[in-house]
Swiss-Prot record:
Disordered: annotated segments: 41-112
GO terms classed as biological process: axillary shoot meristem initiation; cell-cell signaling involved in cell fate commitment; maintenance of root meristem identity; phloem development; phloem or xylem histogenesis; procambium histogenesis; regulation of cell differentiation; xylem development
Glycosylation (residues): P107
UniProt-listed InterPro entries: CLE41/42/44 (IPR037495)
Name of protein: CLAVATA3/ESR (CLE)-related protein 44
Gene Ontology cellular component list: apoplast
Length: 112
């Protein structure tokens, strides 16, 4: 018995519908498995963070002085030593109190 072209196309159409149905079922099963798991993880994360951290209340300390007053934080002056200064002290003074030096004008030549 030979099958006709019409019967072959019907079998092919039926095969594609079955494959499509199987893929749809697998996809839906995957979604149903992932959906509750992710919401469960989110719920567990929320409940664990609530359980591990005790509710905290913030207490502000009352200032001992009124906020309008300020604290004087000036450094105390140290008396300078008289006499000969060491060579390292002279070197430091010369290094940090350098005279004016030439500064190039224009764009930075290094970055160009």
């Amino acid at each position: 018995m030979a099958t006709t072209i019409d019967q072959t196309s019907i079998k092919s159409l039926h095969f594609h519908q079955v494959i499509r149905l199987i893929i749809t079922i697998i996809f839906l099963a995957f979604l149903f498995l992932i959906g509750p798991t992710s919401s469960m993880n989110h719920h567990l994360h929320e409940s664990s963070s609530k359980n591990t951290m005790a509710p905290s209340k913030r207490f502000l300390l009352q200032p001992s002085t009124p906020s309008s007053s300020t604290m004087k934080m000036r450094p105390t002056a140290h008396p300078r030593r008289s006499g000969t200064s060491s060579s390292s002290a002279r070197k430091r003074r010369r290094e940090f109190r350098a005279e004016a030096h030439e500064v190039p004008s224009g764009p930075n030549p290094i970055s160009n």
